[in-house]
């Protein structure tokens, strides 16, 4: 941007490991969430290049020449020290440096961020999510772990039996979810952040078999949002998912969860909630 160039992030629409193994690899950030994050950061373009057989077999030199320097017209390329690309991942930062003068771009290799001498990586973040340690995961990510999606109809247990409506999301199978349980959350609806309590799991107290779902009680929101795209940010772990002896016992526990969440926000007045607009007025992406 300082040099007057538009900014672009190059990534693949399908993770290379998924394409090569034939098995879905879960991701911390889905394509839709990544688009929203890039827009929030002010990135001009997000290139989601298809990872197909042609690109898998492309020699790394051709990848640099034909795609990065050719189709994208890159003039400043920024990579990490362990980047890899091209057939069998043979391309690296050294190759990019070697081709720099020939193709007329300038290479920037940035060092990895570390946390107490450990590289911050997706593996490290997944480990913390599996523990339910979203506060640590958020610190590693540099932003709250979030789940985006359209609000769908659930079983109406929240509104008809427990007395308070909830917003249900069905996360895609590729989304890496944290430990099942209840979390303090912040929910973005129509550019406004609200306080929330989010349960992730299979609703063990309710009879029947339910897929893994994300169900959120939203404070201070009293209107129909079915079909709306919302963003649920997890801020702190409350308790693990558990099966209660009755719906009445579950209702009592949820009231305690709401009190826990309210107390969390009281202790963190710096967190934007309850009607304050996000800077820039960003709308959640469809």
Regions found by a protein language model. Give the residues of each.
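Glycine-rich, Lys/Arg-enriched anion-binding loops that position phosphate/diphosphate groups
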Residues: 100-201
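N-terminal Rossmann-like or analogous alpha/beta NTP/dinucleotide-binding catalytic cores
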Residues: 16-103
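Phosphate/ribose-recognition catalytic cores of enzymes acting on nucleotide-derived substrates
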Residues: 154-278, 282-286
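Residue-level signal for inorganic ion chemistry
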Residues: 38, 77, 137, 185, ...
């Amino acid at each position: 941007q300082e040099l007057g160039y538009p900014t672009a992030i190059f990534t693949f629409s399908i993770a290379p490991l998924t394409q090569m193994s034939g098995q879905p690899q879960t991701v911390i950030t889905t394509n839709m969430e990544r688009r929203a994050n890039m827009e929030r950061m002010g990135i001009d373009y997000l290139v989601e290049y298809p990872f197909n057989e042609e690109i898998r077999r492309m020699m790394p030199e051709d990848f640099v020449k034909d795609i990065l320097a050719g189709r994208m017209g890159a003039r400043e390329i920024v990579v990490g020290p362990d980047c890899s690309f091209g057939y069998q991942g043979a391309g690296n930062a050294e190759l990019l440096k070697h081709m720099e003068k020939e193709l007329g771009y300038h290479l920037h290799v940035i060092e990895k961020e570390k946390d107490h001498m450990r590289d911050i990586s997706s593996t490290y973040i997944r480990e913390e999510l599996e523990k339910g340690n979203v506060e640590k995961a958020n610190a590693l990510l540099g932003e709250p772990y979030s789940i985006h999606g359209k609000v769908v109809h659930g079983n109406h247990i929240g509104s008809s039996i427990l007395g308070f409506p909830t917003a249900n999301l069905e996360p895609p199978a590729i989304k890496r979810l944290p430990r099942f349980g209840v979390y303090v959350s912040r929910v973005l609806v129509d550019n406004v952040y609200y306080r929330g309590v989010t349960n992730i799991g299979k609703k063990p107290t309710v009879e029947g078999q339910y897929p893994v779902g994300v169900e959120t009680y939203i404070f201070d929101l009293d209107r129909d949002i079915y079909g709306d795209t919302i963003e649920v940010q997890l801020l702190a772990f409350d308790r693990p998912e558990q099966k209660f002896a009755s719906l009445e016992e579950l209702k009592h526990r949820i009231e305690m969860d709401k009190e826990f969440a309210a107390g969390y926000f009281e202790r963190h007045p710096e967190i934007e909630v309850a009607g304050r607009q996000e800077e820039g007025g960003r709308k959640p992406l469809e």
